[in-house]
Amino acid sequence: MLDRFSRTQLVFGKEAMDRLKGSRVAVFGVGGVGGYTVEALARSGVGAIDIIDNDKVCLTNINRQIIATGKTVGKYKVDVAKERIEEINPDCKVTAFRTFYMPETADQFDFTQYD
């Protein structure tokens, strides 16, 4: 029976897919590069993704950010990205942080929990 990751498993193998499913990744900034990154991680079968950004989608993002569309302008990027990830991979646990990573917010993140 085919599932959403059967083609990926053909390339990586079952053991690697199990490792991806059990992994947790943090992506800081989900605009340009980060938006494409979280989508690729979700499509690869990563089991948990923490996304960190405090910016909102604006009109000038549409030409270069995968999460930016006419419908997403004005919304927080992490909220848009979370919804997109959950559509792609409903089994992925997504935690959205509406904050920027700064010295004063660094203690919010336990880096030992990420792979």
Language model regions located:
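Conserved N-terminal Rossmann-fold NAD(P)-binding element of oxidoreductases
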Residues: V27-G29, I52
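Hydrophobic/small residue at the entry helix of a nucleotide-binding pocket
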Residues: V33-G34
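Aromatic pocket-lining residues of Rossmann-like dinucleotide-binding sites
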Residues: L41
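Glycine-rich, flexible N-terminal cofactor/catalytic loop recognition
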Residues: V27, S44-G47
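A structured beta-alpha segment of the ubiquitous adenosine-cofactor-binding alpha/beta core
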Residues: G74-Y114
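Glycine-rich phosphate-binding loop and adjoining beta1-alpha1-beta2 segment
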Residues: V46, I51-N89
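N-terminal charged helix/coil linker that caps or initiates catalytic domains
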Residues: M1-A26
